[in-house]
Every structure is written in C-alpha cells, then in structure tokens.
Amino acid sequence: MTSKQRVMAALDHRPPDRIPTFDSFWTEFRQSCIEELGLPADVDIDAHFGTDIRIAVADETPFPTRTEVLEEDGHARTVRDGWGRVVQTFRDAFFYRELEVAVKEKGDLDRLEFDSPQLDQRYAGFERNVERWQDDWCVFCKTGGPYLRTTYLRGEVNFLTDIAADPAFARALA
C-alpha cells in the first residue's frame, strides 16, 4: 500500500497493511540524521522514516504583511512576527525570547486591524505543498489552537492572568 492508500483505508474503517504513522521532526533531528546516518542533504526525512501523513498549513497569523527583521547579527535575530510580537532568537537555539506582544493592554484588542484572511501570500506555501504531496500522501490541514494563538497575541503570563482575573476578556481574546 502507498501512504495515501494506507491512510484512506484507515479512515474508511478498512484494514491497512500497517497502522499509518505521523511524526513531526525538528530541524535539528533532520540534520542529525543526515550526519549520523549518512543520508543525502536533500533527503525527505518524512519519506525516509515512512511517515504516511503530511500537514499543510496556511499562514494563520493576523499580521503577515507586517513581519520585519528589526536587528540581526551573528549571534541573535530580532523580528516582528505575524502575531505582532517582537521576538529574539539566538543562533543554534530552538526557543525564543518574547520582547513585546500586540495586545499589551486590554484596550489594545479593540484597536487591532487584522490583515485580510484572503491575502494570496497566506496560501502560497500551503497550495504549493498540497500540490506537491497530494498524489502520494494524505494531506491534512491544520490551524493552531486557541490557547497558544492567544498567548502569541497577549503573552502567556498576561493571558493566564486574564483567565483568572477577567474571564470575560479572556473569552473575547481567545
């Protein structure tokens, strides 16, 4: 069975040749596999490990047109991302430092003007991936959940405080 046939069989409640698999590999894992297993640099790591599902994601950020690099040197990079946050990443580090969020004060929520959900740039990578994968894999779409996406707008500590102190605002924000 191909990956697509395997997933479709499972979704149709027919027995596949094996249980369909999915994983999400970090960039560092991919690089380690290339080095330690002697794989070619252009290896499709999902295909190599028999992953049966591909995930296509459109740009779900509220402000994709406002992203910009604010500062960059050999050690760190500071950007305004599509969530309106200012975040700093460090070379060879997976996590980031959040320096600023879009909804600093509760009143900021009423002043936000999101970019159109119909912007072509939101879907360019999504459409390219679906087209590339659809013949061989089952392609699933995803969006992020309300908790993480809300923390991106408000900041995690602020949002958790809002949940406890002002549940009505937290609901409006999420």
Predicted regions and their residues:
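Catalytic cores of TIM-barrel enzymes
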Residues: 1-174
